[in-house]
């Protein structure tokens, strides 16, 4: 019963994929507090720490632990915390999952191992190992443009039968997929989109929410959009979605999280510091971001 309760609270609704703030090439814990408290203020359904948007691949293991520990302290059980545990090394991914459990997050997310191109059986065994490494609920993360490999529908079905694998975050472009998955998996397996621009279309096909990049700076508007959708106010949700579309576009004009890091900096949340091999936003991208922030009257 406890696992089902956690699933209901975490893998559903608006989950913000948080940026990780840096200053002088170190974690900026003061900025982290501003960022996290901004999410708590607008009652997002959960925050995702150390995912793709959080530059997880640039973090040392010690930084990863400090980031999670500090986030748990700041949140103080106000909202659930999901940690990112993706790695192309199964042993290291297990270590991330075990450390997440020890620190006290509420669940974790992981993608298939990137670069090494495992078979579907290899992907299954990777997640089976993560499942055995901890007691936390798990969300699968499908991001084929990043990882270079994806779950087949059959592998998702197999993995959904493991008792603590409870959701899928899908960053693909196949809008039929949630319908196909929904038809085969257990009833309480949730599917969410990771693409801001398709949230309404995705949820119309069986999704139950989204992990958002834009909600780093507009959690209040994203929350309102989902609330209208869940109340069957399709017109109201669509109006908000159309208003946000230029923001979604601006935030992906260059590789995520380059634009959202600059947007957060422009609004005073953190330094515009991003780790190599990523570089800060180009001048043209900065101008596009500034213009849409001004036109939408976004303030922190």
UniProtKB/Swiss-Prot annotation:
EC number: 4.3.3.7
Residue positions of the active site: 141 (proton donor/acceptor), 169 (schiff-base intermediate with substrate)
Compartments where found: Cytoplasm
Recorded metabolic or biological pathway in which this protein acts: Amino-acid biosynthesis; L-lysine biosynthesis via DAP pathway; (S)-tetrahydrodipicolinate from L-aspartate: step 3/4
Keyword set, alphabetical order: Amino-acid biosynthesis, Cytoplasm, Diaminopimelate biosynthesis, Lyase, Lysine biosynthesis, Schiff base
Cleaved signal peptide residues: none
A biological process from GO: glyoxylate catabolic process
Site (Part of a proton relay during catalysis): 52, 115
Highest taxon above the source species: Bacteria
Main location group: cytoplasm
GO CC, alphabetical: cytoplasm
PROSITE patterns cross-referenced by the UniProt entry: DHDPS_1 (PS00665), DHDPS_2 (PS00666)
UniProt xrefs under SUPFAM superfamilies: Aldolase (SSF51569)
Gene3D superfamilies reported for this sequence: Aldolase class I
Alphabetized GO MF terms: (R,S)-4-hydroxy-2-oxoglutarate aldolase activity; 4-hydroxy-tetrahydrodipicolinate synthase activity
Binding site for pyruvate: 53, 211
Reactions performed catalytically: L-aspartate 4-semialdehyde + pyruvate = (2S,4S)-4-hydroxy-2,3,4,5-tetrahydrodipicolinate + H2O + H(+)
First-level EC class: lyase
Record keyword Membrane present: no
Subunit description: Homotetramer; dimer of dimers.
Its job: Catalyzes the condensation of (S)-aspartate-beta-semialdehyde [(S)-ASA] and pyruvate to 4-hydroxy-tetrahydrodipicolinate (HTPA).
NCBIfam families: dapA
Name of the protein in question: 4-hydroxy-tetrahydrodipicolinate synthase
The encoding gene: dapA
